[in-house]
């Protein structure tokens, strides 16, 4: 799955924060603050939640957040906290009651974490097997999920609805581009999904490249539409649309290949191919809490200060829901002809 789909660098705030205020008292020296990040996805067998700790500081007792983030014992609570997710469903009078299903969170160690802000390559995460519970949901009911984390005498809670159903899909099966200058646009259409307040889409064009009769190397160019609220999207019935310019693919390839011709010493004997369905569309739907979190951090940027938005009671972070899907699609005959006509070395296989 593409990293940028709803990733929004959620882990970027798992660090130690300067003193400020909302619902948690941050003025005690070196007080640990629960920081929680979790996105429920009903289509996945396993859902992961990060439960870490940050430390407040003040000017008299400063903390270097970057140094602490690299120390596993500083970011993690000792042992395993009692954590679980309780399912609720709507009933008479729009009241929500417990269904009896509880997702117990266990811990596991991820061993392939790349180097970055936080300690690596081994990181502790919490997880739950929830697909069996989610698949029993009735389409005529609404559901919400409440997270409970017990830390000593404190209980941290958060709540979210569940985004998505099996009708969520991309309808478009082919993209249409042209090489000639054009101000026109085309659309990618997809079916809306319950509880989503925004969608994030990207398409990736994959191709193969061989230099001097060497081995084929996979290349790609991508275009991101960015996170769009449902109010920003065109809609017809239950179908949303996003628009892309007809020249988009050719502009991307021109930037990637670096010239309008391959007949020069830097590109000898370059041959390129593409598959019958060379474009992958990545689409994600996200819940209200995640959208609010993205919007706030887009305005303030990431820093060592506590973000203005959190839906974690007794801590910080975000607990929300998303649904990701991918679809491989073709490109029109005109697009193929225009690609073969450019001096970029594209050939039919």
Stretch-by-stretch model annotation:
Residues 1-4, 21-22:
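Positively charged n-region of N-terminal signal peptides that target proteins for export
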Residues 4-5, 221:
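Residue-level detector of intrinsically disordered/flexible regions characterized by low predicted structural confidence
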Residues 5-12:
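Sec-dependent signal peptide hydrophobic core
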Residues 21-349:
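A sequence/structural signal for flexible, mid-protein segments enriched
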């Amino acid at each position: 799955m593409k990293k940028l789909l709803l990733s929004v660098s959620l882990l970027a705030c798992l660090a130690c924060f300067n003193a400020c205020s909302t619902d948690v008292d941050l003025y005690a020296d070196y007080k640990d603050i629960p920081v929680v990040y979790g996105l429920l996805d009903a289509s996945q067998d396993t859902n992961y939640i990060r439960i870490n700790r940050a430390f407040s500081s003040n000017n008299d007792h400063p903390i270097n957040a970057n140094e602490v983030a690299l120390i596993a014992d500083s970011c993690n609570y000792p042992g395993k906290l009692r954590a679980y997710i309780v399912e609720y469903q709507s009933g008479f009078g729009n009241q929500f009651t417990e269904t009896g299903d509880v997702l117990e969170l266990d811990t596991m160690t991820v061993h392939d974490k790349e180097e970055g802000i936080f300690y690596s390559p081994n990181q502790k995460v919490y997880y739950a097997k929830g697909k069996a519970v989610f698949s029993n949901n009735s389409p005529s009911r609404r559901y919400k999920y409440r997270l409970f984390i017990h830390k000593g005498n404190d209980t941290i809670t958060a709540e979210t609805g569940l985004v998505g159903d099996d009708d969520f899909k991309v309808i478009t099966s082919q993209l249409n581009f042209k090489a000639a200058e054009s101000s026109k646009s085309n659309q990618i259409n997809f079916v809306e999904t319950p509880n989503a307040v925004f969608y994030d889409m990207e398409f990736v064009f994959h191709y193969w490249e061989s230099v001097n009769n060497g081995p084929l190397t996979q290349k790609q160019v991508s275009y991101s539409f960015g996170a769009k609220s449902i109010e920003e999207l065109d809609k017809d019935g239950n179908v949303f649309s996003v628009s892309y310019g007809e020249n988009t693919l050719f502009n991307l390839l021109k930037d990637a290949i670096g010239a309008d011709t391959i007949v020069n010493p830097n590109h000898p004997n370059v041959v390129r191919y593409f598959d019958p369905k060379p474009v992958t569309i990545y689409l994600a739907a996200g819940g209200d809490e995640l959208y609010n979190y993205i919007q706030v951090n887009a305005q303030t940027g990431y820093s060592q200060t506590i973000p203005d938005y959190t839906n974690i009671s007794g801590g910080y972070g975000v607990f929300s829901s998303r649904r990701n899907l991918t679809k491989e699609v073709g490109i029109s005959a005109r697009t193929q002809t225009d690609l073969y006509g450019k001096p970029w070395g594209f050939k039919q296989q």
